Amino acid sequence: MAEYKNYTLNFGPVHPAAHGVLRLILELDGENVVRADPHVGLLHRGTEKLAEFKPYNQSIGYMDRLDYVSMMCNEHAYVMAIEKLLQLEVPERAKYIRVMFAEMTRILNHLLWVAACGIDLGAMTVFLYAFRVREDLFDCYEAVSGARMHAAYFRPGGVARDLPTQMPQYQKTRFTSKRKAKKLNEPRQGSMLDFLDHFVVDFEKSLDEIDTLLTDNRLWKQRTVDIGTVTAERAKELGFTGPMLRGSGVAWDLRKTQPYEVYHKLEFDIPIGANGDCYDRYLVRMAEMRESNKLIKQCVDWLRANPGPVLSDNNKVAPPKRNAMKNNMEELIHHFKLFSEGYCTTEGEVYVGTEHPKGEFGVYIKSDGANKPYRLKMRAPGFAHISAMDELLSGHMLADTPAIISTIDVVFGDVDR
């Protein structure tokens, strides 16, 4: 009589649905997954140790390269941890700018997620719709920092510069006709706040388009409903955070439960799911984008009415004004000291957790009073989610694997560090 054995399959690390360098060793019984063993570490770059050998203010750029889809949200937790060590006051305007860009980053992350998830499940159109909208937000990144991705815009004590009064303009190129450039530039004639007023209105329409494409789509529901189900109790036991936890029906969001910056002054809801499956996680992220859009609008209205400083006036932490530096020896010394050796913090340890688009992103710093951390540890939300891969995949078909991996929304820049 023939002997039947389970089949072992290597999924990744170069599979297009692996979302980075994920390697899964799957044990299959026919087309059913019996066991899944995730292997991580293929993108390890030693970020924590690198930051321990540099002054605090020279490691902000490393944060952008952790979860390289949610750049400013990584910076946010890091600079807040430094501010907590220094007991540094941040100008109110800078707090609103940070929150506004954190919510823009959340939208950037979720749009890329729904685009990639759509491609994984065979819905190509949503990818094109989502990337069209992301360009507008990348223009905002570029306007404040000069970079479209790795901005390094947040600073201990505030942000690098105030919002621009003129948005970057599109030019006629080989790929952009003069007529198209003129149309793209229509909402970009004023300040960034004017541009964002246009954006929050247009973005609601864009989300409605994606909703129409996917939410009630029969094929989309067949691929996501009752797939990768996790109960609320089990999600808490597994250490889930963010949309993975809220998709299981747990209303836990650090912006509400442990508010930081100015979130306690803003109005927004926490969307939660009911069944804890892939479809609920999709619905939660779609609803979160609408809430982020409301938060951006509230920040725009406040910033328009309240001009002011955007960086601390403590020149031991924040660089002095350039014209002052060129005319005053004291400011020149502050500038030289800041960019050569940085600043020393008080001895102690701090932990700051923020509501990152993927979950709780935390930064732990232990300081011995020097100008660099004695120990820096980062909590990546994706690590706990990857750890549950065996439980999520077991009992499902091999074809469901891309759907489950996709709704976890993992990026290996922060998992492997």
From Swiss-Prot:
Known catalytic reactions: a quinone + NADH + 5 H(+)(in) = a quinol + NAD(+) + 4 H(+)(out)
Major subcellular site: membrane
MF-aspect GO terms: NAD binding; NADH:ubiquinone reductase (non-electrogenic) activity; quinone binding
Membrane topology: Peripheral membrane protein
Coiled-coil blocks: none
UniProt keyword list: Cell inner membrane, Cell membrane, Membrane, NAD, Quinone, Translocase, Transport, Ubiquinone
Protein's cellular compartments: Cell inner membrane
InterPro entries: NADH_Q_OxRdtase_suD, NADH_UbQ_OxRdtase_49kDa_CS, NDH1_su_D/H, NiFe-Hase_large
The enzyme's E.C. designation: 7.1.1.-
Group of enzyme by EC: translocase
GO cellular component, as recorded: plasma membrane
Family: Belongs to the complex I 49 kDa subunit family.
Job of this protein: NDH-1 shuttles electrons from NADH, via FMN and iron-sulfur (Fe-S) centers, to quinones in the respiratory chain. The immediate electron acceptor for the enzyme in this species is believed to be ubiquinone. Couples the redox reaction to proton translocation (for every two electrons transferred, four hydrogen ions are translocated across the cytoplasmic membrane), and thus conserves the redox energy in a proton gradient.
Subunit structure: NDH-1 is composed of 14 different subunits. Subunits NuoB, C, D, E, F, and G constitute the peripheral sector of the complex.
NCBIfam families: NuoD (TIGR01962), PRK06075.1 (NF004739)
Protein's UniProt name: NADH-quinone oxidoreductase subunit D
